Amino acid sequence: MVIRSVNLETVCGITSKIPDNPFNEVAFAGKSNVGKSSMINALLNRKSLARTSAQPGKTQTINFYNVNDAMYLVDLPGYGYAKTSASEKEKWGKMIENYLHTSKKLQAVFLLIDIRHDPSANDKMMYDWMVYQGFTPIIIATKLDKIKRSQIQKNVKVIREGLKVKPGTVIIPFSSETKQGRDELWEVIDSFVLPQEETEEEDK
């Protein structure tokens, strides 16, 4: 994917109406310290488009990034931050649920899991909830550069078994630092958001 233009086009808060976008969307969800903003920046070849922070739980809105006037990458609020109040967690949950139910252009949901650790209870809850909503989440195993190459397959297996993923579920090991996994991730995204003839043209 050649990134020609990227714009943070819409930011939705608790009371905002979900936009009726003209292009297909893919959404990214993950625990608040999983590296979602860094992954989006690496994916889009931008250093600080999605704001990163040492403080978990920074993303508290749904952010719509228009890419090449052809698709939207949607950054959902991070979940599972311990210092977030119960009322705030409930609001974020309703906001995400509203988006999943309301968006007419959502084609796929990606769930980010830290490849270094077993999936948390919140990760499992989010995965099961997405499946219940009718999606088959694609898993992005982040922070790939933090483990040895010899550990990759073992850790991916731990994620697969920990989430009890559906057969055939795609798991993409990804590093925001080295951008390993970026091309594979774009191939998966393109398969959902681009017309078939355009995808075939890019493969030539």
Predicted regions and their residues:
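Hydrophobic aliphatic residues
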Residues: 43-47, 100, 163, 189
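Conserved G1/Walker A P-loop phosphate-binding module
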Residues: 1-83, 194, 199-204
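Conserved nucleotide-binding/hydrolysis micro-motifs of P-loop NTPases
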Residues: 58, 71, 78-81, 116-118, ...
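Helical mechanochemical/support elements of P-loop NTPase systems and associated helical scaffolds
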Residues: 22, 48, 61, 88, ...
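Canonical P-loop GTPase G-domain recognition
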Residues: 3-15, 146-204
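Conserved C-terminal guanine-recognition region of P-loop GTPase G domains, centered on the G4
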Residues: 97-169
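Conserved nucleotide-sensing/catalytic segment adjacent to the nucleotide-binding pocket
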Residues: 68-106
